[in-house]
Amino acid sequence: MQAEYNDYMLLTRRYLKDYKKMQSDIGVWEQQKADIKAELSDVSVAISRYGGEPGGGSGDMTVVERQAETRGKLEAKLSLIDHNIGELRRVMKTVETAVSALEPEACEIVWDHYVERVEWNVIADRLYLSSAAVRQRGHRAIRDVANTIFVNRAGTYEQVVLIA
C-alpha cells in the first residue's frame, strides 16, 4: 500500500506543478480549434460515403473525394482536440476542488509552492512560521489533496486515470 500511496502523492504533485502548463495547453488547443474551424469553412464539400465507409483512398481520387478526405481528417482532428481540452479541464477542476477543500492556510501553502513555485522559506516568512513547519503542513496538505482526488468513500485507493 505504501508504494501506491507514494504514486498517488507524486501524481498529485505533478498535477499541481503542471497546472499552469495545462492552462496554457488549453489556450493553444483553443487556438488550433479556431484555425481548424476556419480551414473547415474553406472545405465546402460534405464527406462522400460509399456504403458505411468513407470514400476514396486510391491514388486517383477526384477533387471531391480529396476535399472529402481533407474534411474528414480535419473533423477527426477537431474531435481529438475537443476530447483533450475536456480531459484537461476535468483534471484542473478536480485539482481545484481538492485544494479548495483544504483549510485556508494549507490551501495557500499548496497553491503558492506547487502552482506558483514560491519557495518554502518565502511562504514561511509571509505566514510567520518556520520553514520546517510550512514544509510539514504542505506535505500534509498534499496527502489530503491526494486522498480527496484518489480515495473512494470506502477508504481504498481507486484505480483512476485522470490523464490518459
Segments predicted by a language model, with ranges:
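DNA major-groove recognition helices of helix-turn-helix
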Residues: 95, 134-148
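Short amphipathic alpha helix immediately N-terminal
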Residues: 101-118
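Juxtamembrane/interface motifs at transmembrane-helix termini
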Residues: 129-132, 144, 155-157
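Short, well-structured alpha-helical interface segments that form or flank functional binding sites
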Residues: 14, 24, 90, 105, ...
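Helix-turn-helix DNA-binding module
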Residues: 116-133
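N-terminal interaction/assembly modules
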Residues: 1-98, 147-164
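A short hydrophobic/aromatic micro-motif that marks alpha-helical segments and, especially, helix-coil
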Residues: 38, 118-120, 145
